[in-house]
């Protein structure tokens, strides 16, 4: 089963001085909220029979690829609600926030650092998930209501 995480985004491993939450850039939100109507629509796809399951939760964004359980555990200590870790979502969320554009981040969970066969989990991902990812994204976009 492929999991897709989407929803709120929080930067991690950035300290921007006193008066800011860990990961918060001065003058900007600590957490970028996903657009509620887009999130609701995305979650409704779970009822369509898609092969992929969609989950909503916090995405922790950083500046490196996480390859081991120690790094993942450190992130989870800072952000216990974290569903996924990536390197892109916060930058996209911040840009959308600054320009007033509705935001939602679809993330495919490609691997879980620290589990047995982590490397093959990641390698197998590229051969099996492209089509399913496209189908999920296409279904999401093609079924968006006109009023969004």
What is each PLM-predicted segment?
Residues 92-124:
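Zn-dependent metallopeptidase/amidohydrolase metal-coordination segment
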Residues 1-10:
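Single conserved hydrophobic/aromatic residue that forms the stacking wall/gate
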Residues 43, 90-93, 97, 134-138:
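Predominant activation on well-ordered alpha-helical scaffold segments within soluble catalytic domains
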Residues 15-84, 99:
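Active-site rim beta-loop-alpha module in soluble metabolic enzymes
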């Amino acid at each position: 089963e492929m999991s897709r995480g989407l929803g709120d985004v929080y930067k991690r491993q950035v300290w921007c001085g006193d008066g800011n939450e860990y990961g918060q850039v001065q003058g900007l939100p600590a957490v970028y909220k996903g657009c509620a109507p887009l999130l609701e629509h995305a979650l409704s796809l779970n009822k369509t029979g898609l092969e992929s399951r969609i989950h909503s939760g916090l995405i922790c964004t950083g500046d490196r690829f996480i390859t081991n359980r120690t790094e993942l555990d450190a992130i989870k200590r800072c952000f216990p609600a974290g569903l996924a870790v990536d390197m892109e979502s916060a930058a996209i969320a911040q840009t959308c926030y600054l320009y007033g554009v509705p935001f939602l981040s679809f993330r495919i969970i490609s691997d879980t650092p620290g589990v047995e066969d982590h490397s093959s989990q990641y390698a197998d991902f590229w051969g099996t998930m492209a089509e399913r990812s496209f189908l999920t994204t296409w279904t999401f976009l093609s079924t968006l209501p006109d009023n969004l």
